[in-house]
């Protein structure tokens, strides 16, 4: 099986690297690693109906909100996010976190993050256009939470 491009996609200070893309796994899974700097609050609360997402902590701690519950994911911790569950995460701690995300089936790919990065870059350091962010999210199967 071929592996992902390992291209680093940057959205502000957030860095994403795909290790396995859906096209590499026959569509069964996509795996990406992401680094979130201390103090970062990302992304917009959202859900996805077409795939499950499992998060595995490597370094640092991310604080997830999943269906209204607060869950900290640190090194060695795993969090399963079922289809349709509203979630988001922040790095409320003093160190950068590194986390692995496993998406099954592997329908979320680097194109989504590239498009989000382009919207963020167009904001020139200001807040990204929420309408444009929502359009990109919906195009890639994510539903922004109200």
Predicted regions: what they are:
Residues 15, 54, 61-63, 70, ...:
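Structural motif
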Residues 114-146:
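Acidic/histidine-enriched, glycine/proline-rich intrinsically disordered or flexible terminal extensions
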Residues 43-45, 66-71:
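Short beta-strand segments
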Residues 8-9, 68-86:
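Short acidic-glycine-tyrosine-enriched beta hairpin
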Residues 9-45, 51-52:
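A short glycine-rich, His/Asp/Glu-containing loop-to-beta-strand
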Residues 63, 83-110:
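Ligand-binding loop in jelly-roll beta-barrel domains
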């Amino acid at each position: 099986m071929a592996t992902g491009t390992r291209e680093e996609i940057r959205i502000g200070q957030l860095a994403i690297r795909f290790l396995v893309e859906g096209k590499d796994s026959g569509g069964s899974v996509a795996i990406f690693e992401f680094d979130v700097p201390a103090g970062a609050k990302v992304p917009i609360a959202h859900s996805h109906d077409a795939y499950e997402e499992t998060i595995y902590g490597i370094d640092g701690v991310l604080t997830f909100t999943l269906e209204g519950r607060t869950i900290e994911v640190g090194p060695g911790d795993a969090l399963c996010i079922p289809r349709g569950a509203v979630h988001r995460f922040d790095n409320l701690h003093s160190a950068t976190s590194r986390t692995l995300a496993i998406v099954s089936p592997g329908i979320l790919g680097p194109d989504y993050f590239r498009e989000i990065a382009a919207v963020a870059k167009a904001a020139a350091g200001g807040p990204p256009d929420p309408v444009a962010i929502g359009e990109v999210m919906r195009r890639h199967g994510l539903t922004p939470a109200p």
